[in-house]
């Protein structure tokens, strides 16, 4: 199973990082409080769009050959994307922690660190890198979710909590999570079904901010999700395929938001 392999590899990677820089050193480097910028842009009127910076994935392999995180961030800065998701997972998604720092230099958009967080160390690290929010995946963390969620909040990060089924949703709601990401991709099989959002959204309280992730390919998909009550969408592969054509991506965003 790909997810198990990713988690095993990530745990080893974090242990290596701890040997190089102990968690105590990391905590001492933390500066700045809570900005709330990520949550704010998701809650504004109309549907919000999170554009992802992603070179590869286990299911698709290399998505963007001539990958340049700064160039992509500059495109997102120019079009009406509301936040940026930065993939930092190295082994399976060809990401890098430094992409967050690079993007932060050229973009004013709030940044979500997208990785497989398995250790509290990564939460402190995310804050130091300059992320405004982190992704916590219920299928990875299970009953550790509440502690990881509370720690993230305590260091000044918003938290996108990812679920894929009803059981995971209940865990997220019991932990008091205020931003729920419905992943239309099953991380066990990597199969995608955009109807996952429709099937689960009815169980989510109205005061929760809802993000739909994966399998979103057209402006029509986004308008459909908005009609269900989704507050934001996260788009990776679809944008990576057209990122070199700023007019095309700008038109896509305008049409998705109802202005095209």
UniProtKB/Swiss-Prot annotation:
Query: What's its EC?
Result: 4.1.1.48
Chain segments annotated as transmembrane: none
Q: In which pathway does it act?
A: Amino-acid biosynthesis; L-tryptophan biosynthesis; L-tryptophan from chorismate: step 4/5
The question of whether Ubl conjugation is a record keyword is answered with: no
Q: Which UniProt keywords apply?
A: Amino-acid biosynthesis, Aromatic amino acid biosynthesis, Decarboxylase, Lyase, Tryptophan biosynthesis
The reaction(s) this protein catalyses: 1-(2-carboxyphenylamino)-1-deoxy-D-ribulose 5-phosphate + H(+) = (1S,2R)-1-C-(indol-3-yl)glycerol 3-phosphate + CO2 + H2O
Enzyme class, UniProt record, top EC level = lyase
Source organism (scientific name): Thermoanaerobacter pseudethanolicus (strain ATCC 33223 / 39E)
Give the InterPro entries listed for this entry. Aldolase_TIM (IPR013785), Indole-3-glycerol_P_synth (IPR045186), Indole-3-glycerol_P_synth_dom (IPR013798), Indole-3-GlycerolPSynthase_CS (IPR001468), RibuloseP-bd_barrel (IPR011060)
Q: Which GO terms describe its molecular function?
A: indole-3-glycerol-phosphate synthase activity; phosphoribosylanthranilate isomerase activity
Q: What HAMAP family does the database record attribute to this sequence? A: IGPS_B (MF_00134_B)
Is Amino-acid biosynthesis among the key words of this record? yes
Q: Which GO terms describe its biological process?
A: L-tryptophan biosynthetic process
Cited SUPFAM superfamilies: Ribulose-phoshate binding barrel
Similarity-based family: Belongs to the TrpC family.
The name on file for this protein is Indole-3-glycerol phosphate synthase
């Amino acid at each position: 199973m790909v997810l198990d392999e990713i988690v095993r590899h990530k745990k080893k990677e974090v242990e290596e990082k701890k040997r190089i820089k102990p968690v105590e050193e990391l905590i001492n480097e933390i500066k700045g409080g809570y900005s709330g910028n990520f949550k704010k842009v998701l809650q504004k009127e109309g549907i919000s769009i999170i554009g992802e910076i992603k070179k590869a994935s286990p299911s698709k392999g290399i998505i963007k050959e001539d990958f340049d995180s700064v160039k992509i961030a500059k495109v997102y800065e120019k079009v009406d994307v509301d936040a940026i998701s930065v993939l930092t997972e190295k082994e399976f998604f060809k990401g890098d922690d430094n992409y967050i720092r690079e993007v932060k230099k050229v973009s004013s958009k709030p940044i979500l660190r997208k990785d497989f967080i398995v250790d509290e160390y990564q939460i402190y690290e995310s804050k130091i890198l300059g992320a405004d929010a982190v992704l916590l995946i219920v299928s990875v963390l299970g009953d550790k979710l509440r502690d990881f969620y509370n720690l993230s909040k305590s260091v000044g990060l918003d938290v996108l909590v990812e679920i894929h089924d009803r059981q995971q949703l209940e865990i997220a709601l019991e932990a008091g999570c205020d931003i729920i990401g419905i992943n239309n991709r099953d991380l066990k099989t990597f199969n995608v079904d955009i109807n996952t959002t429709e099937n689960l959204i009815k169980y989510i309280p109205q005061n929760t901010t809802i993000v739909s992730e994966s399998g979103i390919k057209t402006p029509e998909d986004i308008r459909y999700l908005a009609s269900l009550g989704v507050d934001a969408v996260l788009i990776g592969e679809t944008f990576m395929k057209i990122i070199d054509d700023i007019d095309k991506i700008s038109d896509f965003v305008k049409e998705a938001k109802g202005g095209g």
